[in-house]
Amino acid sequence: MRCLPVFIILLLLIPSAPSVDAQPKTEDDVPLASLHDNAKLTLQGLWDKRCCPNLFYCCPDRRK
């Protein structure tokens, strides 16, 4: 029964603990949107390298 008050105090302190979002941003922090854009550009570049100039059906952007 001695542990019960300690357990209750710990439960009360958990919601008041600072969250991850409360930490100040550093110069190394990168927003997730830019990571998504970088991945999209990389995949698009790899897709373009796969396509040959004479195979227009494999490149949706090069259909003309």
Swiss-Prot record:
GO terms for molecular function: toxin activity. Keywords: Cleavage on pair of basic residues, Disulfide bond, Secreted, Signal, Toxin. GO terms for cellular component: extracellular region. Expressed by the venom duct. Coiled coil: none annotated. Residues 23-48 form a propeptide. Contains 2 disulfide bonds that can be either 'C1-C3, C2-C4' or 'C1-C4, C2-C3', since these disulfide connectivities have been observed for conotoxins with cysteine framework V (for examples, see AC P0DQQ7 and AC P81755). Its main location: secreted. It holds the Pfam family Chi-conotoxin. The keyword Membrane does not apply. It is found in: Secreted. Residues 1-22 form the signal peptide. Belongs to the conotoxin T superfamily. The cysteine framework is V (CC-CC). This is Conotoxin Leo-T1. It comes from Conus leopardus.
